[in-house]
Regions:
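Phosphate-binding glycine-rich loops of NTP-binding sites
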Residues: 1, 17, 212-218, 264-267
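Conserved ABC ATPase signature
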Residues: 154, 167-170, 174-220, 227, ...
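Electropositive, glycine-dotted interaction segments
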Residues: 16-159, 163
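Short, hydrophobic/aromatic-rich segments at coil-to-beta transitions
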Residues: 4-13
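C-terminal lobe/lid and adjacent interdomain/linker elements of RecA-like ASCE P-loop ATPase modules
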Residues: 243-306
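Short, mixed charged/polar active-site loops
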Residues: 19-23, 197-199, 287
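Short acidic, glycine-rich loop/turn motifs
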Residues: 13-17, 54, 191-195, 283
Length: 306
């Protein structure tokens, strides 16, 4: 049931680990009261707070960098606050103040965040980037839209685990294989499927086949990230492909978070990798929460106050 808003509009994001923790608080700008300088950007969010600390829990003594509005302060080598800097309200201290000398911790966290990969929904329609021929360059990391699929697969074949790629394809499509050829400077994907007289081009693949090959390229990256997040990887896949997808996910060389609505995929993955944690989500007054987790079961966390 809806209620009257009692707090300021805002968006808070944060994470923590054994080494560092980071949190930010976005909010709306203070409306301009100057009639001579009106603005049309009153809904453009800005940073209200931004904090970086050592360890898993935010404590005043653990703070390494602290930002309130435009003012940012960082600790020096002795642990004392080294004055204050001012940055734009729409700029992050991670981008503006990360420096290997002044505050190396900001640089470490920034590069760690940059290495994380999130794959949400790959397009598989007729005009999808993954169906087009592209200029070939070494591609150790599949782009978020999958447009460099052919280059990513060829990079795995030449510089990565070619055997794992062949196995992932044959697990899903017995006696089939992928080939990448160069045509007038462009890389073109060819899919050799058992029973067909000629290979299929990317433009001819079914949505499910194309999407599976995209997951192969993402999960067998020669440059695995620290954190890889897949959102509903079962979309468009035939149910018979889910065991092969589960086996592919289980072999990933990264901390992996898979958001799925397909219980057969979850069950198949749990059977292959029993050490994987299964967390069920549910709605509670419009908010997404972990099922069965009470207040006492939540990890220790403190949001920085505005």
């Amino acid at each position: 049931q809806g209620t009257v808003r009692t707090k300021a509009v805002g968006l808070r994001l944060g994470f923590s680990g054994d080494e560092f923790g980071y949190a930010l608080d976005f909010g709306l700008p203070v409306p301009s009261s100057d009639p001579l300088r009106p603005t049309l950007f009153n809904l453009d969010p800005e940073f209200k707070r931004e904090c970086l600390w050592r360890g898993p829990v935010l404590r005043p003594a653990a703070l390494l960098a602290d930002r309130a509005g435009p003012a940012v302060r960082v600790r020096d080598d002795s642990g004392a606050w080294a004055g204050s800097s001012r940055i734009g309200l729409t700029d992050s201290m991670l981008s503006e103040l990360a420096d290997p000398r002044a505050c190396p911790e900001l640089l470490v966290v920034r590069e760690r965040l940059r290495s994380w990969r999130f794959y949400d929904q790959f397009r598989t329609d007729a005009d999808a980037p993954a169906r087009q021929d592209r200029i070939g360059t070494r591609t150790p990391v599949l782009d978020h839209d999958g447009g460099d699929l052919a280059a990513a697969l060829r990079t795995i074949q030449e510089f990565g685990d070619d055997e794992a790629l062949a196995e992932a394809v044959s697990d899903a499509f017995p006696r089939s294989r992928v080939e990448v050829e160069a045509v007038d400077g462009l890389l073109r994907l060819r899919f050799h499927q058992h029973g067909l007289l000629r290979p299929l081009a990317a433009a001819e693949l079914s949505d499910g086949t194309l999407r599976y090959l995209l997951w192969v390229a993402a999960l067998l990256s020669p440059r695995p990230p620290e954190l890889l997040v897949l959102n509903e990887p079962e979309t468009s896949l035939h149910p018979d492909l889910l065991p092969a997808l589960a086996a592919l996910i289980a072999k990933a060389r990264a901390q992996l978070i898979v958001v799925s609505h397909a219980r057969p995929l979850v069950h198949a993955l749990s059977a292959i990798a029993p050490e994987a944690a299964v967390l069920e989500l549910e709605k509670e007054f419009g908010a997404t929460v972990l099922a069965g987790q009470g207040r006492l079961g939540r990890p220790a966390w403190h949001w920085p106050k505005r």
